[in-house]
Amino acid sequence: MTESFAQLFEESLKEIETRPGSIVRGVVVAIDKDVVLVDAGLKSESAIPVEQFKNAQGEIEIQVGDEVDVALDAVEDGFGETLLSREKAKRHEAWLMLEKAYEESATVTGVINGKVKGGFTVELNGIRAFLPGSLVDVRPVRDTLHLEGKELEFKVIKLDQKRNNVVVSRRAVIESENSAERDQLLENLQEGMEVKGIVKNLTDYGAFVDLGGVDGLLHITDMAWKRVKHPSEIVNVGDEITVKVLKFDRERTRVSLGLKQLGEDPWVAIAKRYPEGTKLTGRVTNLTDYGCFVEIEEGVEGLVHVSEMDWTNKNIHPSKVVNVGDVVEVMVLDIDEERRRISLGLKQCKANPWQQFAETHNKGDRVEGKIKSITDFGIFIGLDGGIDGLVHLSDISWNVAGEEAVREYKKGDEIAAVVLQVDAERERISLGVKQLAEDPFNNYLSVNKKGAIVTGKVTAVDAKGATVELADGVEGYLRASEASRDRIEDATLVMSVGDEIEAKYTGVDRKNRVVSLSIRAKDEADEKDAIASVNNKQEEGNFSNAMAEAFKAAKGE
C-alpha cells in the first residue's frame, strides 16, 4: 500500500513536470549551425534554434555538456518529437529575477531602447519595461541620446506578470546612490568655491550640472562674457567642467553656477583700452533688425546701430551691409561700462560724403542732379556721393508760390540749383532754384527809391484795395483808403482790373515782397508842387515890378 502511494505520488510529479509550459533542465548534447540539441530526459531530444542561445552581442553562450533550463512547449508534436524553448525559459528566469528584485527593492540592469508616449522602453533580459519620462533622472531630461544603448541600473516600482506590465525607475537608483555623496557635498559646499561636475541636461536657458548628488544650474548668461545664443555653443551633455559656485540656497538646495567667472572680466577698464574714436577690427556675431553685433575681443561685443552703418542709407537692413562672420573695421562711439554696452560705428571708418561736399562746395556754387523725390515741403536732388540736397518750396521761384511752382517738376528731371547752406554735422544741404536768376524784387527796389512815382497795371481788385503789377515779378498794393483824396469805402468803385495807374511808392514789405502804393499821396504831392510853382511865379512877378520902379527912380523920372 505504501509503495503504491509513493509510486502514484512520483508519477503525479512527473505529470506536472511534463505539462506544456513547465521548466525542465536539460543537457546540451550537440551544437549545429542552426540548432542546438538538448536532452531533457523526455521521449526524445529536442532541436532548439541556435538564436535562442545567443547573448546580446550575438555570441553563443553555451557549450556541449552544459546544463540549461528550457521550457516545455509540447511533449509530442505529432511527429514523435519533444518541443523545447530556451527563450521562454529565459523569460521565465527574467520574471523570477524581476519578482525578487521587486520584493527586495534591489536594482536590475537594463538598456533604454526606445521612446514611447510618456516615457521610454527598457529591455530587461528579454522583458520589455516602461520607464516614465519623469523617472529618467532627478531632473527633467528632454534628450536621452546619451543614455540610449548603455547598460543602466533601474529599480522595479511596479510588476504585473499576468498583464505583462513592468514599470522601472532610474531616478530611484540615482537618488539612492547619491544620498551619501549628496550629504557630504551639501555640508562642504560654499559660495565662491570651484567644483567639478558633469553636464547632464541642456535647456534654452542654461545647463544642469551634476556636482555629485546635487544638481546646479549654469545659466546661459553665466557661461561666457560674450553673447551666447544657446548653451550648446559652450557645453555638451556629458562634458566634465569646472565651475564656480555663485549662489547656494541651503534651505531650498539650489545651486547657481558660473563658468565665465573663472576668468577675468573683460569689461573692467574697457573704456581705457578703447577710448571714444578708436578704430579697430572685429567679427560680426549676430544680425538684428536694428543693427549688428561685433565682437571686438573675446567676451566683448558692441552694437552697430543701423543708423551708423551707412552714410546715405538710413533704413537699410543690416543683412544688406554685412554678414555673420565678416571681419569689419568699426569705430568706438560710446562706452557704458556700468550697463556693459558699447556703441560702434561702421560708416565712421569710411569717407563722409557730407563732409566731402562741404569741403568742395561753397555757398553760391551751382550744382546739378536728378530729382529723387518731391514732398510737401520741397524737392530732393541727388548729388555726388549718394547724398541729397533739398530745394524748399520757398526757393523754387521768385514770382510763383512754391505749391504752384513745384508742379512744373517731376521725379527723374535733371535740375540745376545753387548751394545755399551746408550743415555736414546734421547732414543737410539747402539748395535753391530761384537763386539761379537775380531777384526782380530787389532789382526793382534798387532802381526805385521810396517816395518815387511809379506806374503799374491793376491785376486784382476788391473792396479793400487793389493788387498792382509794377514789373515782371514785382507787385504793389494800393489800399482803398489810398486810392483817392476823397473818402473811398470800396476800391472797386474807382478801379478795375487792367487799369493803368500812377502812384507814389510809400513803403515796402520785404517779407511778403510787396510795395505799398498811394494815389492819394501822389495827388497830395502833385497839389503841393503846383502851389509851390504858383507862389514862385508870383514872387518872380513882384520882383520884376520892384526892379522897374527902382530903375525909374534912378533916372529921375
Curated annotation (Swiss-Prot):
- Establish whether keyword Magnesium is in the entry: no
PROSITE patterns tied to this protein: S1
Superkingdom of the source species: Bacteria
Q: Name one GO cellular component term.
A: cytosolic small ribosomal subunit
Sorted alphabetically, which keywords does the UniProt record give?
Repeat, Ribonucleoprotein, Ribosomal protein, RNA-binding
Q: Which residues form the S1 motif domain?
A: 21-87, 105-171, 192-260, 277-347, 364-434, 451-520
Q: By its UniProt entry, which InterPro entries does this protein fall under?
A: NA-bd_OB-fold (IPR012340), Ribos_protein_bS1-like (IPR050437), Ribosomal_bS1 (IPR000110), Ribosomal_protein_S1-like (IPR035104), S1_domain (IPR003029)
* Record bears the keyword Repeat: yes
Annotated GO biological processes are: translation
Q: Kindly list the GO molecular function terms attached to this UniProt entry.
A: mRNA binding; structural constituent of ribosome
Entry's family note: Belongs to the bacterial ribosomal protein bS1 family.
Functional summary from the UniProt entry: Binds mRNA; thus facilitating recognition of the initiation point. It is needed to translate mRNA with a short Shine-Dalgarno (SD) purine-rich sequence.
Know the name of this protein? Small ribosomal subunit protein bS1
Lineage at the top is:
Bacteria, Pseudomonadati, Pseudomonadota, Gammaproteobacteria, Enterobacterales
